[in-house]
Structure formats: structure tokens, C-alpha cells
């Protein structure tokens, strides 16, 4: 094997490389050049989550030298492949990799590098009520790391799926049931509790509010000197703010508890965005929120964005 690799290395040394020998015909600098959609196994250290995940990576460097025909993509690929060596992803590790990418392209006058990683964080989630019952839930994650000169920036984006019940629809449903109750019992001076209970058992769902699966996409800046990514903590904060995250394994008691949570957390899309933003702004830097309710009443979605006031709402 070593002899074969040596022969290949010797052949590469003798093979032409037009990215070095040929001049760029247009002679223009390029903002970013690189690759997208590289498959990569990475390790993510989050409590209660699977460590080994399949990621898709995008990686680029800038090409400010107008005379250089092309960058060295194999160098970027090799450095990116180092993320698969078993060390857990961290801000420091991503910064080291980007610095190495810039250093590997000094002959291109490169000053900046960036990487985007997409993967699903698989977390174990327990049932709401039933002891010993649990299941796995996947949370889409995106990491964006950029090094420009000496400035390193890292953002994490997570997607949380939850249930939303429309407050307006709930009010209309309650009104319908109220009127139906008055029609049934309004003429009576006294109503026995058992009769009320029997009526409710039969008619309490004569009108039901519409609810739907919804999603919150949250992006926050991570500290450059952080030792971990803190993804599960971010996800937990979003789910706690919303109050109705979708469940994995359930039995009837858990489904009932979920119905109670929905009834206690009626929300418009505006309510959801404000809840999440308020839960994050004291803990995370530059939180940005986008929520989407996949309306069951309409064929279109309801959406809202939130961002720090000084940044505007150009979120996620």
C-alpha cells in the first residue's frame, strides 16, 4: 500500500497543474470558490444524543488574486476530511480548520475561508406522562463558520417542530359550544352536574379549534472561545418557550397530556415568534427567529420573523 501511494504521489508531482501554470483569462477576483454537498461523518457531543452523525459540508475560500486561474480544491477537501477523525465538533476546532485552509492558499492571496455543515441531531425524548417510554427525534442543524483575516464568526441554526392551536378558532369553538349549551339547558332553572357532564361528554367537541404542525427555525451566534456547541440546550429553550413540541412514542395518557398543553398554549404565529425571541435574547448573542404555521384552515402558511431590534428582522 505504501509503495502504491508513493507511486501515485510521484505521478502527481509529474502531472500538469494548469491552475498553477495557466493564467486566468478574465483576470477578475472571485468572492468565493469551493465545493458543496460533501458527505462527511462527524462527531457531535450533546447529552442524550447520538454522537456520530452524517453531515453535508460546503467549503469555500476567497480568490482575490485576479491572475490565479483556480484554487486547490483537493487541499480544502483534505483539511475538511480532518473533521472525521473522531474529535467532537467545537468552535475552536472549526477555527483551526479554517485557518489551515487560508494558509494552504497563500499562493492564491486567500484571506478568508468558510464552511457550512448540515446534519440531523438525533435526541432521545421521553414521553410526557408514561414512565419508561421514549423515542428518538431528529432536529435539523446548520453550522456556519467564517474566518476573514483574524475575525472568526460561528452561527448555529436549529429547527424545532411543534403544534400550534389558533386562539381565534378556539374562541369561536367555545362560543359555539356555549350557545349549544344554552339551547339545551337555558330554559331550566337548575341543572344537575351529572346532566352537564353527560352533555359535555357528548357535545364538548361539537366544534374544535384548528391546529397544525409548525416549525421554528432559530439562529444564534456562538462564542468563538466556546468548548462546546450547546445545540441541545438551544433546542430545549425553544421547546420550553413554545410549550408544545411534537412527541415521539406516546400512549393515551401522553396524548391527553399533549392535548392539555395545546389548550394551554394557544398561539398565533406572532405569539410563537415573540415567545422564542424572548426566551433566547438574554442567553444567546444575536438570536434570529423564523416561525411557520402550516395552516390546516388555509392552503397557505402563516409566517413571522424576529431579530434583535438593532439588526432588523432579516432573520434566518
UniProtKB/Swiss-Prot annotation:
Biological process (GO) annotations held by this record are: tetrahydrofolate biosynthetic process
Q: Which InterPro entries match?
A: GTP_cyclohydrolase_FolE2 (IPR022838), GTP_cyclohydrolase_FolE2/MptA (IPR003801)
- Could you confirm whether the keyword Hydrolase appears in this record? yes
Pathway annotation from the record: Cofactor biosynthesis; 7,8-dihydroneopterin triphosphate biosynthesis; 7,8-dihydroneopterin triphosphate from GTP: step 1/1
- Residues the record annotates as the site (May be catalytically important) are 166
GO MF annotation terms: GTP cyclohydrolase I activity
What EC identifiers does the entry list? 3.5.4.16
Q: Which reaction does it catalyse?
A: GTP + H2O = 7,8-dihydroneopterin 3'-triphosphate + formate + H(+)
Recorded superkingdom: Bacteria
Coiled coil feature spans: none
Tell me which Gene3D superfamilies the record gives. Urate Oxidase (3.10.270.10)
Sorted keywords for this record are: Hydrolase
Q: Which NCBIfam families match?
A: PRK13674.1-1
Query: What family does the Swiss-Prot or TrEMBL record give for this protein?
Result: Belongs to the GTP cyclohydrolase IV family.
Q: What is known about what this protein does?
A: Converts GTP to 7,8-dihydroneopterin triphosphate.
Q: PANTHER family recorded for this chain?
A: GTP CYCLOHYDROLASE MPTA
Task: Kindly provide the name given to this protein in its UniProt entry.
Answer: GTP cyclohydrolase FolE2 2
What is the organism of origin for this protein? Burkholderia orbicola (strain MC0-3)
Gene name tied to this protein: folE2-2
Amino acid at each position: 500500500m505504501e509503495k502504491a501511494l508513493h507511486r501515485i504521489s510521484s505521478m502527481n508531482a509529474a502531472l500538469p497543474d494548469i491552475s498553477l501554470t495557466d493564467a486566468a483569462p478574465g483576470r477578475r477576483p472571485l468572492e468565493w470558490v469551493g465545493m458543496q454537498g460533501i458527505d462527511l461523518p462527524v462527531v457531535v457531543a450533546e447529552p442524550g444524543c447520538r454522537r456520530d452523525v452524517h453531515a453535508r459540508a460546503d467549503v469555500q475560500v476567497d480568490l482575490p488574486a485576479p491572475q490565479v486561474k483556480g484554487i486547490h480544491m483537493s487541499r480544502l477537501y483534505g483539511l475538511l476530511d480532518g473533521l472525521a477523525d473522531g474529535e467532537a465538533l467545537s468552535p475552536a476546532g472549526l477555527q483551526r480548520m479554517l485557518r489551515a485552509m487560508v494558509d494552504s492558499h497563500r499562493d492564491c492571496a486567500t484571506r478568508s475561508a468558510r464552511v457550512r455543515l448540515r446534519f440531523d441531531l438525533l435526541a432521545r425524548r421521553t414521553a410526557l406522562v408514561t414512565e419508561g417510554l421514549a423515542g428518538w427525534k431528529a432536529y435539523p442543524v446548520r453550522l456556519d463558520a467564517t474566518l476573514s483575516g483574524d475575525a472568526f464568526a460561528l452561527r448555529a441554526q436549529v429547527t424545532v417542530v411543534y403544534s400550534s392551536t389558533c386562539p381565534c378558532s378556539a374562541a369561536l369553538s367555545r362560543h359555539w359550544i356555549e350557545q349549544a349549551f344554552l339551547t339545551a339547558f337555558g330554559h331550566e332553572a337548575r341543572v344537575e352536574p351529572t346532566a352537564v357532564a353527560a352533555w359535555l361528554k357528548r357535545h364538548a367537541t361539537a366544534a374544535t379549534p384548528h391546529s397544525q404542525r409548525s416549525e421554528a427555525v432559530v439562529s444564534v451566534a456562538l462564542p468563538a472561545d466556546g468548548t462546546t456547541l450547546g445545540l441541545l440546550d438551544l433546542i430545549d429553550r425553544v421547546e420550553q418557550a413554545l410549550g408544545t413540541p411534537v412527541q415521539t412514542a406516546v400512549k393515551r395518557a401522553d396524548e391527553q397530556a399533549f392535548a392539555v398543553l395545546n389548550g394551554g398554549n394557544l398561539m398565533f404565529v406572532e405569539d410563537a415568534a415573540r415567545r422564542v425571541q424572548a426566551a433566547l435574547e438574554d442567553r444567546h448573542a444575536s438570536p434570529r427567529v423564523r416561525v411557520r404555521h402550516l395552516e390546516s384552515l388555509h392552503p397557505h402558511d402563516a409566517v413571522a420573523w424576529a431579530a434583535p431590534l438593532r439588526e432588523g428582522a432579516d432573520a434566518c
